[in-house]
UniProtKB/Swiss-Prot annotation:
Source organism of this protein record: Pseudomonas aeruginosa (strain LESB58)
PROSITE patterns in UniProt: TRUD, UPF0024
Secretion signal, residue range per the UniProt entry: none
Record-linked SUPFAM superfamilies: Pseudouridine synthase (SSF55120)
Purpose: Responsible for synthesis of pseudouridine from uracil-13 in transfer RNAs.
Catalytic reactions of this protein: uridine(13) in tRNA = pseudouridine(13) in tRNA
CC annotations in GO: cytosol
Top-tier EC class: isomerase
Protein name (record): tRNA pseudouridine synthase D
Gene3D superfamilies: TruD, catalytic domain, TruD, insertion domain
Residue intervals of the TRUD domain: 160-306
Family: Belongs to the pseudouridine synthase TruD family.
MF terms (GO), sorted A to Z: RNA binding; tRNA pseudouridine(13) synthase activity
Gene: truD
Keywords, alphabetical: Isomerase, tRNA processing
Length: 355
């Protein structure tokens, strides 16, 4: 089986060649993620919400430990999004405890997991409920000219970056996509829920990245065309662009963006040449598109351009670059980094990115 590389799974950079190279995640503290939740918690209800800090531990394992310590089934443990194992992350979990007092969760805690806050709420934490993720990245072993770095950082702060799905969506060497293709060709879905979700996500993400890569290559990823479906940064709704919408000032302000397809049932609701391009993509991957539709996936959209909120940087040491920024939920920090620097492999088996 051939190993799929970064260009196979993502696509070209938008802002030119990398300015240099660095190491990301020499230690967990080099990659810090804080979930941003815009839900006012009531302090009462049958769901116990936990603000958890974890180090070197993935979200699913943290959820299993919390569930075991609380004595509840895994289906009663919820979280908004997956976070990388090779990082220091803080995120919310909820436990469904109807008619029960707060359990002793000491058995779940340790050097790699700490519960920082507990509160009650009337509803469980839904997947995708977080508004954003805040990142603090420490890039070490830096080999690049500061003037070039500063200019590139100023540019991506002003213009955003292509909103590719990151490498980890596809598994090591693109293995999740390989398995998704195999399932599509055999017209089957894994019985295991986690595997099914992983493979479907890999297939949809690959098709989106293919479309985005085409538009990056021709320089249209950050411009609206007649027939595009436009969406605001934090909205899942979209509307069709005519000539007037293509002149909307909110496009230049990075509030409004063209979108690409997250494939599902039916044809994309885009128009004109945009629809032709998206149907041509589907025609190049017929088995994958049929499989996604048959699995009951709804056709959705994802913004092509990723605005970077609050980007700040400094150099705490001569060979260290520290970045701080906020991204919408579901977006990947390393697609920001790849527009700045090449990452030097550290021998880790997981890809160096989180969302």
């Amino acid at each position: 089986m051939s190993v799929l590389g970064e260009l196979d799974l993502l696509g070209p950079r938008a802002h030119g060649a990398a300015c240099g190279e660095a190491v990301l995640k020499a230690v967990a503290e080099d990659f810090q993620v804080d979930e941003v939740l815009d839900i006012p918690l009531s302090g009462e209800g049958e769901h116990l919400w936990l603000w958890v800090e974890k180090r070197g531990l993935n979200t699913e394992e943290a959820a299993r430990r919390l569930g075991r310590a609380a004595g509840v089934q895994q289906k009663n443990v919820s979280y908004a999004g997956l976070k990388d194992r090779q990082a220091l992350t803080r995120q919310w979990f909820s436990l469904h405890l109807p008619g029960k007092a707060d359990p002793d969760l000491g058995a779940a805690e340790g050097a790699d997991l700490r519960i920082l806050r507990r509160t009650r709420h009337s509803r469980k934490l839904q997947r995708g409920a977080h508004a954003a993720n805040g990142f603090t990245l420490r890039l070490t072993g830096l080999r690049a000219e500061r003037a070039l770095l500063d200019a590139r950082l100023e540019r991506i702060a002003a213009d955003g970056v292509p909103n590719y799905f990151g490498l980890q969506r596809f598994g090591h060497g693109g293995g999740n996509l390989v398995d998704a293709r195999s399932c599509a060709e055999q017209d089957l879905l894994p019985a295991n829920r986690n595997l099914r979700s992983r493979f479907l996500s890999a297939g949809r993400s690959y098709l989106f990245n293919r479309l985005l890569a085409e538009r990056v290559a021709e320089g249209s990823w950050n411009r609206a065309a007649v027939g595009d479906l436009l969406a605001f940064t934090d909205s899942r709704s979209f509307f069709l662009a005519g000539e007037e919408e293509c002149r909307d000032a909110r496009l230049a302000a990075l509030d409004l963006h063209p979108t690409g397809p997250l494939w599902g049932e039916g044809d994309p609701p885009s128009g004109a040449g945009v629809l032709e391009r998206e149907l041509a993509l589907a025609g190049s991957e017929p088995a994958l598109c049929r499989w996604l539709a048959k699995a009951g996936m709804a056709h959705e959209r994802r913004i092509l351009r990723l605005p970077i909120q609050g980007l700040a940087w400094h150099y705490p040491e001569p060979d260290v670059l520290q970045l701080e920024f906020v991204l919408p939920a579901g977006c990947f920090a390393t697609v920001v980094v790849r527009e700045i620097l090449d990452l030097v492999p550290t021998g880790q088996t997981e890809n160096p990115c989180a969302y």
